Amino acid sequence: MAQTCDLCGRGPAFGNRISHAHNVTKRRWNINLQSVRALVNGAGRRMRVCTSCIRNNKVQKVA
């Protein structure tokens, strides 16, 4: 599925956009996904991973 992390499964957050006149429309906050070459079962594979997984060393990058 689009806009989800391949490691943790985290996706976008949903909420409302509220104007000064208090008109309410739906909006979404997308996560920061980066395309990374990672080691999966000993082979390099391209994955879409969120930056929190990269920062917490949950992905092992291919050199």
Curated annotation (Swiss-Prot):
It comes from the Bacteria. Pfam families: Ribosomal_L28. One of its GO terms (biological process) is translation. The keyword Ribosomal protein applies. The keyword Ribosomal protein applies. Transmembrane segments: none annotated. Keywords: Ribonucleoprotein, Ribosomal protein. GO terms for molecular function: structural constituent of ribosome. InterPro entries: Bacterial_rp_bL28, Ribosomal_bL28, Ribosomal_bL28/bL31-like_sf, Ribosomal_bL28_bact-type, Ribosomal_bL28_sf. GO terms for cellular component: ribonucleoprotein complex; ribosome. Belongs to the bacterial ribosomal protein bL28 family. HAMAP family: Ribosomal_bL28. This is Large ribosomal subunit protein bL28.
